[in-house]
């Protein structure tokens, strides 16, 4: 008698009330139907952080899995690409800059939103761990939609119409930046990219706090130093344990 292997059933389980969901029972190296793809997409949008368990990717398989969530965006730093896959970048403390020194790319231990200096920043960031340190190396994510809603009304009213001027690396961080990135900044054409400090989600209509302290040159109407002080205070107000999830790979 032949016994057919059971097909795993994809399950999506919430991790915390305000953020995070865990996905099991799906292999993204294999084709999936549109209903499954849509469930994954909606879970990512609605839960902010989506943990998809038990995956094993080559760089190309990883890029194909990422395409399930939308069109891919090239990383602005083209120096540290995965072998044979131009749409996948590596974050590693083994990377070297053009002078042969350890590249300053690994210690991203500040709250930020990726690529705010781009006209069309990405909707999602996708991470896959290949090699881990003995300790540390987790990734923290915060639901800045719920964090925004929890702000005092007067602070929400104050930031609703604020706009930020964004560059590849802000002036106040020039002294700690990767020299190759600094050179890219100096050679960049055009002025800073202007974005709202509070963005409205195009599909859900929800508002969220949205900025990158390392790329925000200033809030329009403020000086750079005043901007950094204000953003630090805003993060202090917004980042709460109930809105945050730290993923340990």
Question: What residue ranges belong to the model's regions?
Answer:
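Non-heme Fe(II) oxygenase catalytic core, chiefly the N-lobe of the double-stranded beta-helix
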Residues: 2-249
